[in-house]
Amino acid sequence: IGYQTVIYKDITLQLGEVYNLNVEMSESSELLNEVIVTAAKTKFTAEKTGATTNISSAQMTQLPTVNRSISDIARLSPYANGMSFAGGDGRSTNFTIDGANFNNNFGLSSNLPGGGNPISMDAIEEVQVVVAPFDVRQTNFIGGGINAITKSGTNTFRGTAYTYYRNQDMRGNRINGEDLGARSDESKTTYGFTLGGPIIKNKLFFFVNYEKEKTPGEVIKYRAREDGEDAKGMVSRTLKSDMEKVYNHLKDKYGYDAGSYTNFPADEENTKLLARIDWNITDRHRLSLRYNNTKNTAWNAPNGNSSDTGYRLNNTYRVGTQSMAFANSMYSMDNKVQSWAADLNSRFTDKIS
């Protein structure tokens, strides 16, 4: 003897919201072979311990974001301004992934590790922004904290493939009727995929995300001047003929190719990889393993401290109206971050876990 099926629709709960649903069921004479109960538990605690903003993956999909970054999503909190909260220093903000700290330990800027966004937005299930919480479990920061929960596999195989493209034609050049002039060339291409599913149904699951960003650019926009040409704008007083002489001297005497002095390609690349395994060991023990790898490559012009012009070139490094450099004098800065995290949840009794 069982009960007839009762279906309630159009009930939507926000993270942390408590809702009581009173259900009246009628008896049925049918014999039930089995009862299957499925539920999706909230990733964060339902008890608020301060000003909290929770953002689901569905909301993140609908939100406009230019940079596809955590700071874009955190703007849903009225306290947020980039990685700064309530007017505080962004370096004091704490960022966690699946409960593990993921901060910029170097401490010179509020940028996250990896030279950009260390985790793809398509790998995030939920984001929580907290400001001055009084929960003693949330520590190591002053002011604001961002907690991100990554996606995990389910009993159904699911995958996505995506690409995003942006260039200067997608950016306006007029504000309040004022023409800002010609837009400089720029482009950014992002592509990636996600895949998740069961290894053993109801027991072992996997989730993988890969994403790559490419941003073509030029670090040096100055050019050497022709004979008789004025050195103004983006034209250096260094003569093109002098650059040619130096190039030929290095090539003939030392066999060294100094590179171009008219073209300075400096493409920036960012690669992200995330892999996660979830294991339901028993009804009382669950284990999660996550691996995250981020690599960012950015090119820089020669350092301004090595200039022989008698003063430091803060804005243009060693290239500007007074001097020029060759392409092979540039250097790349590779920012690599690897992170491992393991989370074991065990419930020994109804009161001890």
Predicted feature locations:
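Outer-membrane beta-barrel domain signature, strongest for Gram-negative TonB-dependent receptors
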Residues: 213-353
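Periplasmic N-terminal accessory/gating domains of Gram-negative outer-membrane beta-barrel systems
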Residues: 4-24, 31-152, 177-179, 192-194, ...
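Transmembrane beta-barrel domains of outer membrane proteins
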Residues: 86, 130, 147-149, 196-198, ...
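Extracytoplasmic loops and strand-loop junctions of Gram-negative outer membrane beta-barrel proteins
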Residues: 55-56, 108-111, 128-130, 175-179, ...
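Outer-membrane beta-barrel channels and translocator barrels
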Residues: 151-153, 200-202, 282-284, 349
